[in-house]
Structure formats: structure tokens, C-alpha cells
């Protein structure tokens, strides 16, 4: 059974690019273009990993992460923040609030794929 990744980003080009690449690598991919949709899909689809953008309208990634962590149905889903915010304080905040990784945009595809595999290895050892 392939692992399911939920990609959350309000930029359609990034969403579609990641969906295409991750499917080519054998992952089952779901997408959401906003925070409310992400929360619904996380509960319904129970992905193995969520790649979550921070800067989104209406509900940003920080709020989504907080709500994922307090819901017992989604609290244990690994979340990797995926953001153009590159300051150390943002990376620290993401990790302190429960993200398993913080990936800065722009990212290299190879780096992203290695990080995803590393996350699945870490989660598998728990």
C-alpha cells in the first residue's frame, strides 16, 4: 500500500507540480488549497504525511497546525511545513508547534524527496 501525502498550498502551480511529482514517485496524493479544506481532508483521508504551506489566506498554516494537533483524529499525523518564510524564528516556531520538519521554498526536488523518505523512516521507528 502506498503512503498518502496531503499537500496544502494556495498556489495552484506548486500544488499541481507536487501532486504530479509525488504520484510519479508512487505516493497517493491528496491536495487542498486552503486551511479549512486541509482540516477536512486530514480527518477524512488520514494521510501518512501533510506538507503544509504557512502563508495562505483565511486560515494560515500555523492555525491549521494548531488545530491538527488538538484534534485526536489528526494529532499524530506528521506535518512538514513548506514555506517561503526562511527566518530561523519561523523554523523554530514550526518545530515547537509540532511540525516534524520545516522545508524552505524554493526547495530542490531531490531535497524534498529525501526529506519525505526520512520522515517516513523516522515515523516508522516510533
Report each predicted region and the residues it spans.
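The C-terminal output helix
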Residues: 117-126
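Charged docking surfaces used in two-component/phosphorelay signaling
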Residues: 16-24
Amino acid at each position: 500500500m502506498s503512503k498518502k501525502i496531503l499537500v496544502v498550498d494556495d498556489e495552484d502551480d506548486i500544488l499541481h507540480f507536487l501532486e504530479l511529482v509525488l504520484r510519479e514517485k508512487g505516493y497517493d496524493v491528496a491536495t487542498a488549497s486552503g486551511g479549512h479544506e486541509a482540516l477536512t481532508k486530514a480527518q477524512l483521508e488520514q494521510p501518512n504525511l501533510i506538507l503544509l504551506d504557512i502563508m495562505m489566506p483565511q486560515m494560515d498554516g500555523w492555525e491549521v497546525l494548531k488545530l491538527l494537533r488538538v484534534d485526536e483524529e489528526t494529532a499524530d499525523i506528521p506535518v512538514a511545513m513548506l514555506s517561503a518564510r526562511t527566518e530561523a524564528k519561523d523554523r523554530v516556531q514550526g518545530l515547537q508547534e509540532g511540525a516534524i520538519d520545516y522545508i524552505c521554498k524554493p526547495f530542490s526536488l531531490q531535497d524534498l524527496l529525501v526529506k519525505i523518505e526520512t520522515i517516513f523512516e523516522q515515523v516508522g521507528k516510533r
